[in-house]
Amino acid sequence: MLRLDLQFFASKKGVGSTKNGRDSESKRLGAKRADGQFVTGGSILYRQRGTKIYPGENVGRGGDDTLFAKIDGAVKFERFGRDRKKVSVYPVAQ
């Protein structure tokens, strides 16, 4: 009697899953208005986490550290102290 020893191999490759391939959505942080630009009161000037830039004249700070203009005027990014920055809004005479 003739015995056949057959071995079958997979015709389709098994596909494993990966634990990579996802990332959080970007938060669009940073400057929203340029130095010297005219803004209206309530305009967002800078979005940040923590106080990378401090509020100066006529600028408020929101609960998430966003800096916004309190009055209509021109934006001015300034340095104060040795290594700190602030943003101010100065009224423009018309």
From Swiss-Prot:
Stored InterPro entries: Ribosomal_bL27, Ribosomal_bL27_CS
GO molecular function terms listed in the Swiss-Prot or TrEMBL record: structural constituent of ribosome
GO CC list: cytosolic large ribosomal subunit
SUPFAM superfamilies given in the database record: Ribosomal L27 protein-like
Keyword Ribonucleoprotein annotated: yes
Disulfide bonds, paired cysteine numbers: none
Keyword flag Ribonucleoprotein: yes
GO terms, biological process: translation
Family: Belongs to the bacterial ribosomal protein bL27 family.
Classification via PANTHER family: LARGE RIBOSOMAL SUBUNIT PROTEIN BL27M, RIBOSOMAL PROTEIN L27
Protein's name according to its UniProt entry: Large ribosomal subunit protein bL27
Gene name, Swiss-Prot/TrEMBL: rpmA
